[in-house]
């Protein structure tokens, strides 16, 4: 959810630092949503892996996305938007609300994110199957996923069983530094 702010004044009210990315809980998400009520907002699917897969699909390359969404409007939007972009969605529906990044652009062009991981953070290794990987050539893993060791190891194992190569988007230097042993 993207909103253009009229000033920087509401960051204190939302509990966010301007220019950063902060993981937020559902309570803070609701607080930010209340600030967004009076603003024009735009919905877009996203996340680094989702953006990469959508870009590849738009180039005509068969692409799929494995993830977890909630049974809600954001989850439905994500599924439909990804499919509109030509991505085969392999989305598990969970009980928790769908994740979303509340994205704020201030008048000076600075962007700030309040990211609620939601259902996406509850995807677990046992929910993956080799069938999800069949028919593809490459498994692309978002860098922040390396923090869930059992999930990433299972995904890589199943991808290898299905004959895929593995690609890592390491996101930032600190992800590499903090997770060097697993990489």
Q: Residues of each region from the PLM?
A:
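Ribokinase/PfkB-type carbohydrate-kinase core domain
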Residues: 1-19, 41, 81-93, 103-183
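Glycine-rich phosphate/adenosyl-contacting loop at the front of the ribokinase-like
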Residues: 1-64
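A glycine-rich beta-to-alpha transition motif near the start of alpha/beta enzyme domains, typified by
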Residues: 34, 63-89
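Charged, low-complexity surface patches
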Residues: 45, 71, 148
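A general structural signal for well-ordered alpha-helical segments in protein cores
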Residues: 49-53, 75, 152
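Short, well-ordered alpha-helices that flank and scaffold nucleotide-derived cofactor binding pockets
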Residues: 54, 58, 80, 157
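Conserved beta-strand edge residues that scaffold enzyme active sites
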Residues: 70-71, 96, 173-174
């Amino acid at each position: 959810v993207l909103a253009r702010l009229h000033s920087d004044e509401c960051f204190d009210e939302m509990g966010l630092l301007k220019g950063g990315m902060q993981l937020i809980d559902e309570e803070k998400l609701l607080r930010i949503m209340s600030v967004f009520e009076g603003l024009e907002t735009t919905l877009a699917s996203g996340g680094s892996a989702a953006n990469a897969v959508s870009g590849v699909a738009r180039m005509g390359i068969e692409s799929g996305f494995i993830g977890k969404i909630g049974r809600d409007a954001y989850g439905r939007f994500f599924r439909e938007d990804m499919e509109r972009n030509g991505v085969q969605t392999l989305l598990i529906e969970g009980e928790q609300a769908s994740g979303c990044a509340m994205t704020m652009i201030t008048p000076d062009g600075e962007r700030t994110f309040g990211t609620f991981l939601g259902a996406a953070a509850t995807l677990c290794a046992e929910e993956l199957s080799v069938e999800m990987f069949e028919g593809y050539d490459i498994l692309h893993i978002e860098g922040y996923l390396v923090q869930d060791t059992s999930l990433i190891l299972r995904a890589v194992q199943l991808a290898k069983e299905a004959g895929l190569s593995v690609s890592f988007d390491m996101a930032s230097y600190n992800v590499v530094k903090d997770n060097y042993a697993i990489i």
